[in-house]
A protein has these predicted regions:
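Flexible gly/pro-rich beta->alpha loop and the following alpha-helix that scaffold active-site loops
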Residues: 7-72
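Soluble or luminal CAZymes and related metallo-dependent hydrolases
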Residues: 53-57, 144, 204-212
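Catalytic nucleophile loop
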Residues: 65-89
Length: 222
């Protein structure tokens, strides 16, 4: 839904598919909004398993964007990398979460001009085992039963989303295929916040997509 929002709003879009070994730009010149998405890795992943993945390069690029004070939204792994770019240390989430579960806004979240539109609680997507670290200036805006850091604000222009408001049926099918249906069923039996493939496909993702659009519109019009 992030890409669709940018297309719908008529933005000029460039992308770097690091999983296809595309190189990051040398500068952030010409970029006014950086969205860093997720992946199966952690910020300190052993590169032998993912030779294309260079977290140090991604973090350095994000630090350039921070210094330039452009808009940044990090999603899942991108949220964790943003926290490291700010000097924090990512951490393992208390619970692994896969599926749709509610996030609850904190008092700070209810007061945040861009996030408060989510309401007190919002059903969002999840597919993670880690979470962003915190720094002295970080503000937790939303939590869930399984993870205390679902949305974190690092500055008025820089937000970390551990939750996936962008999920849609196509993305879910790709994620199920990547993890495997039997693996997910096994995880569902062993862990409290993992849904079955059938549950994942039955979820309605439209409301969270709408709320994501509202957030992105609010952020970029501030």
């Amino acid at each position: 839904a992030y890409l669709k929002w940018a297309q719908d709003r008529g933005h000029n879009i460039t992308s770097t598919k690091v999983y296809e070994e595309e190189l990051l730009p040398e500068t952030v010149e010409g970029i006014d909004f950086l969205i860093v998405m997720g992946g199966p890795q952690s910020p300190d992943e052993d590169r032998q398993a993912f030779p294309y993945y260079d977290p140090e390069a991604e973090i350095a690029f994000m630090q350039k964007a921070i210094a330039a004070d452009i808009y940044i939204v990090g999603v899942c792994l991108g949220a964790q990398l943003l926290s490291v770019a700010y000097g924090g240390n990512y951490e393992h989430s208390p619970e692994r979460e896969i599926g749709v579960f509610p996030v609850t806004l904190t008092e700070a979240g209810l007061a945040d001009e861009h996030v408060k539109g989510f309401g007190k609680t919002l059903n969002t997507g999840h597919w993670h085992g880690d979470m962003p670290g915190l720094t002295y200036n970080a503000v937790v805006l939303a939590t869930s039963q399984g993870c205390p850091r679902q949305i974190v604000r690092f500055s008025p222009k820089h937000y970390a989303f551990q939750a996936h408001l962008e999920f849609d049926p196509k993305a879910i099918d790709l994620l199920i295929a990547a993890d495997g249906e039997e693996y997910l069923r096994k995880q569902n039996k062993e862990l409290p916040f993992v849904q079955t493939p059938e549950q994942l496909r039955a979820n309605d993702y439209s409301e969270m997509n709408k709320k994501l659009y509202d957030f992105l519109d609010s952020l970029t019009q501030a």
